């Protein structure tokens, strides 16, 4: 017997792919999501740090502006040539400097002397000049400059977030930086890629604070993450391959057993029921193989029942074609017409004979649509003799449509239903409209009769699916069942009606 290793290999590949591919996609999506969230968080923190730093620097600037404004009048009486006034002035400036949340240096310079707290003689050109004031003292006019070396806030931002700060003037000249990549006095030109920053205005001189970060600094963390993910992926590949191979082997063993049982079933050598070694969904197939023999008997019974049903429908077809009530009523009409109008009676007899010849013709079950419409016209003509020309028939069908074939006697039940259930004391107008599409023939029969109530309409629709012997709507029921037998589920019969507004029957059959 053939081995089924190709299937086993295919199953193993499928299992392996279904295991590894989702994990791989999750890892890729996770990596992309990580960097997307990282960028979003960095933008948020840069915005927050920029706003905090701007607020702090503006508060320092405002504080010294208020201080100098308040002391301006008093300083006009201060003589900085006297040691006592010098000491007092230094104490005032040191007090204001030490109150601020930043490392500040003041530089008070006159024409002959200067004072500062920059005892270490740091390079003030590398500091940010927060404010500059011209102050008139008693002995001379001095220039007061307040420099910022750094702030705890900027140090924490650089230490914890890796974000650096720049202060530039209106010409993008660097005034302050805590990053070695930029120098005081050079033009600020941010990199085009991998560089996040945000800028806010600091003062009326159009100086701007810029907080920025180079996201390339996170490459090392990203590489470490990729290495970890790569190791995990390799382990998953190894584990997934081994697991897929074992699972494919188990499943293929059950399938091979099922194939053997199918082969035995073909040769009618299948014994008693034997379950598979491993319980799985394949057990349903195994059960089906054994149930197949029992279902064969049920299938034979179903075929016999269907054949009986077809014979019943054929009997009803013969019964309907003879139309005993229609024949009886027509014969009474002829009997009534013979003494009064022999010519009319002769015409009715000729029409009736043609109708009987048409309905009893058994050479074919299909006819041209033109023949069926001619039969309908004769049928309505006889009914008009009975009902004093109270029925008006209109046929809307092109010549090309009339050459299409249709099942014999498949339109008459629709017209008969319109006359039987739609006629009242007013003239009855029946319109037959036939349209041809690419694959279907659409037949619409509309009357302006009394129509049906919603409950009656629902009852008629339900009766289409009843047994041919269990419904009073024999004509429509028979038509529906015959169409289902002849055309299958492609045939459709829809009924629409409103009380006192007429009835519309839509009949759809596929082209033969």
Curated annotation (Swiss-Prot):
Q: Name one Pfam family in it.
A: HATPase_c
Gene Ontology cellular-component terms for this entry are: plasma membrane
Record's catalysed reaction(s): ATP + protein L-histidine = ADP + protein N-phospho-L-histidine
The membrane-topology field of this record reads:
Multi-pass membrane protein
Q: Does the keyword Glycosyltransferase apply?
A: no
Residue stretches making up the Histidine kinase domain: 297-512
The chain residues annotated with the modification Phosphohistidine are: 325
Gene3D superfamilies, alphabetically?
Answer: Histidine kinase-like ATPase, C-terminal domain
> Which post-translational modifications are recorded for this protein?
Autophosphorylated.
Claim: Protein transport is one of the keywords in the record: no
Say where the protein is mainly found: membrane
Q: State the Gene Ontology terms under molecular function.
A: ATP binding; phosphorelay sensor kinase activity
Where does this one sit in the cell?
Cell membrane
* Keywords, in A-Z order: ATP-binding, Cell membrane, Kinase, Membrane, Nucleotide-binding, Phosphoprotein, Transferase, Transmembrane, Transmembrane helix, Two-component regulatory system
What is the main EC category here? transferase
Q: Which residues cross the membrane?
A: 20-40, 222-242
Q: Which Enzyme Commission number(s) are on file for it? A: 2.7.13.3
**What role does it play?**
Probable member of the two-component regulatory system SE_0166/SE_0165. May activate SE_0165 by phosphorylation.
This protein is called Uncharacterized sensor-like histidine kinase SE_0166
The scientific name of the source species is Staphylococcus epidermidis (strain ATCC 12228 / FDA PCI 1200)
- Lineage of the organism: Bacteria, Bacillati, Bacillota, Bacilli, Bacillales
